[in-house]
């Protein structure tokens, strides 16, 4: 970053890499990246579409390291799955760079979506869903870890809160992992 600071506008990161296999970064990675962004005047942009709103055992995944992103991207869980909602959040220092008429969106400013998101976030708070995800995630990883010790089916479990991955001992050509997913679906 030091060599190219003049050409880097920001650093976009999923606090926990989701689709690639639920990879949790080493402790201090996010706070270190945020510090580098501050040092070189680059925006720290957190993509919390998959990790945000209580899923990882905190309100946001960046909260595990007390990192405040310059820009926060949310979706999916912000409405509790009730209504399609997404948001890009930043403070005035960032948002006021965009002048009226410079940016538009197809469904922007939807009052129903905003009301649904507000209520869903209140439920997350009132029902302590982040704390529940942290507790249940610990139980899940312990139980799967114990199962791994006695089974040859799974080899590893990783994650935070209720965002987890279980690595299946299989080949790429096999359908074992898919069949396990179908069995889990069929059994609730």
Predicted features, each with a name:
Residues 1-188:
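Conserved N-terminal phosphate-binding loop of PLP-dependent enzymes in the Aspartate aminotransferase
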């Amino acid at each position: 970053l030091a060599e190219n600071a003049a050409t880097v506008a920001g650093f976009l990161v999923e606090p926990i890499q989701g689709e690639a296999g639920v990879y949790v970064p080493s402790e201090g990675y996010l706070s270190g990246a945020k510090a580098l962004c501050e040092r070189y005047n680059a925006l720290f942009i957190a993509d919390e579409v998959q990790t945000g709103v209580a899923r990882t055992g905190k309100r946001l995944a960046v909260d595990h390291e007390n990192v405040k992103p310059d820009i926060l991207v949310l979706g999916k869980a912000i409405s509790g799955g009730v209504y399609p909602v997404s948001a890009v959040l930043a403070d005035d220092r960032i948002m006021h760079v965009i002048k009226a008429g410079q940016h538009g969106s197809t469904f922007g400013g939807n009052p129903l979506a905003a009301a649904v998101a507000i209520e869903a976030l209140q439920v997350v708070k009132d029902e302590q869903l982040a704390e529940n995800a942290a507790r249940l995630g610990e139980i899940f990883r312990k139980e799967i870890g114990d199962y791994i010790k006695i089974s040859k089916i799974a080899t590893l479990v990783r994650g935070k809160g209720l965002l987890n991955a279980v690595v299946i001992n299989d080949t790429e050509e096999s359908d074992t992992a898919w069949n396990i997913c179908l069995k889990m679906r069929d059994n609730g």
